[in-house]
Amino acid sequence: MVMSPGSLLLVFLLSLDVIPPTLAQDNYRYIKFLTQHYDAKPTGRDYRYCESMMKKRKLTSPCKEVNTFIHDTKNNIKAICGENGRPYGVNFRISNSRFQVTTCTHKGGSPRPPCQYNAFKDFRYIVIACEDGWPVHFDESFISP
């Protein structure tokens, strides 16, 4: 028995209601957060690291002005949305512990590649926005003392 394209579409649409959309692999905003800000095992953490990572993560078209990479496990970062974080401002959470981070700052000039970056290594509290218990946004404006 051959199913028509319309029947296949109907079966697919019905199956969407059965599979929970909150799974991490289906959470587009969480995946985007990881792509932009997660690097568990960095190497170098200097300007070459920034230029390489920004290019690899496709954050250079145009050159992104500032981006921070968090160097820890996904579980520890996710825990900020729960027991390892507390409310901060209106829609954010601040970590209860410090995280190793590298902040890459565009040196200026043309917003088009090749992009050149400075690197700033730090160990600080971080502020993120969470959605349904998943990190979805990193607050670049917060830098702890």
Swiss-Prot record:
<feature type="site" description="Critical for catalytic activity">
    <location>
        <position position="64"/>
    </location>
</feature>
<dbReference type="GO" id="GO:0004540">
    <property type="term" value="F:RNA nuclease activity"/>
</dbReference>
<feature type="disulfide bond">
    <location>
        <begin position="63"/>
        <end position="115"/>
    </location>
</feature>
<feature type="disulfide bond">
    <location>
        <begin position="50"/>
        <end position="104"/>
    </location>
</feature>
<dbReference type="GO" id="GO:0017148">
    <property type="term" value="P:negative regulation of translation"/>
</dbReference>
<keyword id="KW-1015">Disulfide bond</keyword>
<comment type="function">
    <text>Has low ribonuclease activity (in vitro).</text>
</comment>
<dbReference type="GO" id="GO:0005576">
    <property type="term" value="C:extracellular region"/>
</dbReference>
<keyword id="KW-0221">Differentiation</keyword>
<keyword id="KW-0964">Secreted</keyword>
<protein>
    <recommendedName>
        <fullName>Angiogenin-3</fullName>
        <ecNumber>3.1.27.-</ecNumber>
    </recommendedName>
</protein>
<keyword id="KW-0652">Protein synthesis inhibitor</keyword>
<keyword id="KW-0378">Hydrolase</keyword>
<feature type="disulfide bond">
    <location>
        <begin position="81"/>
        <end position="130"/>
    </location>
</feature>
<feature type="active site" description="Proton donor">
    <location>
        <position position="137"/>
    </location>
</feature>
<keyword id="KW-0540">Nuclease</keyword>
<dbReference type="GO" id="GO:0003677">
    <property type="term" value="F:DNA binding"/>
</dbReference>
<feature type="binding site">
    <location>
        <position position="65"/>
    </location>
    <ligand>
        <name>Zn(2+)</name>
    </ligand>
</feature>
<keyword id="KW-0732">Signal</keyword>
<keyword id="KW-0862">Zinc</keyword>
<keyword id="KW-0539">Nucleus</keyword>
<dbReference type="GO" id="GO:0046872">
    <property type="term" value="F:metal ion binding"/>
</dbReference>
<dbReference type="Pfam" id="PF00074">
    <property type="entry name" value="RnaseA"/>
</dbReference>
<dbReference type="InterPro" id="IPR001427">
    <property type="entry name" value="RNaseA"/>
</dbReference>
<dbReference type="InterPro" id="IPR023412">
    <property type="entry name" value="RNaseA_domain"/>
</dbReference>
<dbReference type="GO" id="GO:0004519">
    <property type="term" value="F:endonuclease activity"/>
</dbReference>
<keyword id="KW-0255">Endonuclease</keyword>
<keyword id="KW-0238">DNA-binding</keyword>
<dbReference type="GO" id="GO:0005730">
    <property type="term" value="C:nucleolus"/>
</dbReference>
<dbReference type="GO" id="GO:0001525">
    <property type="term" value="P:angiogenesis"/>
</dbReference>
<dbReference type="GO" id="GO:0031410">
    <property type="term" value="C:cytoplasmic vesicle"/>
</dbReference>
<keyword id="KW-0968">Cytoplasmic vesicle</keyword>
<dbReference type="GO" id="GO:0030154">
    <property type="term" value="P:cell differentiation"/>
</dbReference>
<feature type="signal peptide">
    <location>
        <begin position="1"/>
        <end position="24"/>
    </location>
</feature>
<dbReference type="InterPro" id="IPR023411">
    <property type="entry name" value="RNaseA_AS"/>
</dbReference>
<feature type="binding site">
    <location>
        <position position="106"/>
    </location>
    <ligand>
        <name>Zn(2+)</name>
    </ligand>
</feature>
<keyword id="KW-0217">Developmental protein</keyword>
<dbReference type="InterPro" id="IPR036816">
    <property type="entry name" value="RNaseA-like_dom_sf"/>
</dbReference>
<keyword id="KW-0037">Angiogenesis</keyword>
<keyword id="KW-0873">Pyrrolidone carboxylic acid</keyword>
<feature type="short sequence motif" description="Nucleolar localization signal">
    <location>
        <begin position="55"/>
        <end position="59"/>
    </location>
</feature>
<feature type="active site" description="Proton acceptor">
    <location>
        <position position="37"/>
    </location>
</feature>
